[in-house]
Regions:
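Beta1/beta-strand and adjacent pyrophosphate-binding region of the FAD-binding site
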Residues: 1-12, 28
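Conserved N-terminal/central alpha/beta ligand/cofactor-binding core
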Residues: 32-140
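Aromatic pocket-lining residues of Rossmann-like dinucleotide-binding sites
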Residues: 20
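Generic hydrophobic/aromatic pocket-lining and core-packing "Φ" positions
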Residues: 16-17, 96
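Catalytic-loop motifs flanking and including active-site residues across diverse enzymes
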Residues: 12-13, 130
Length: 140
């Protein structure tokens, strides 16, 4: 069995640790922050932007790959690796199920928030709840 050491306890580190464990690795995660501060900047997030071709449970309307790509070009000023960006955009369409499997809950779309409810899925309880769900899942 491989051993994996993950340094940090934010969203990316927790996802890496959980995925390594799912792949059969023995995982050690090191987080220097005390429990009430763990998670780094991830505790300040509130949502996930994800591609979807049709309305879904917590996402209204559609947010197709090409529109997501065009939005990414706007915010990066066109300085981005298209291959990696599109790979990430496509993968975003399936990550909510994986997140739910690890205890993340999403809130239903809010009325009057159509512009963001179309592109973003909001975490119930925000980033702190996201991080805590991943820690609970990792401790199982």
């Amino acid at each position: 069995m491989p051993h994996v050491l993950v340094i940090g306890g934010g969203n990316a580190a927790l996802c890496a640790a959980l995925m390594a464990a799912e792949a059969g690795a023995q995982v050690t995660l090191l987080e220097s922050a005390p429990m009430q501060w763990r998670g780094g900047n991830s505790t300040h997030t509130r949502n996930l932007r994800c591609m979807h071709d049709a309305p879904q449970d917590v996402l209204v309307d559609a947010y197709p790959e090409e529109e997501y790509w065009q939005d990414l070009l706007k915010v990066t000023g066109g300085i981005t690796n298209e291959h990696l960006a599109r790979l990430t955009i496509r993968a975003s369409s399936t990550c909510r199920d994986w997140m739910r499997h690890h205890g993340v809950r999403f809130q239903p779309p809010l009325s009057g928030a159509l512009h963001v409810a179309r592109t973003n899925a909001f975490f119930m309880g925000g980033g702190k709840a996201l991080v805590n769900a991943y820690y609970r899942s990792a401790q199982r």
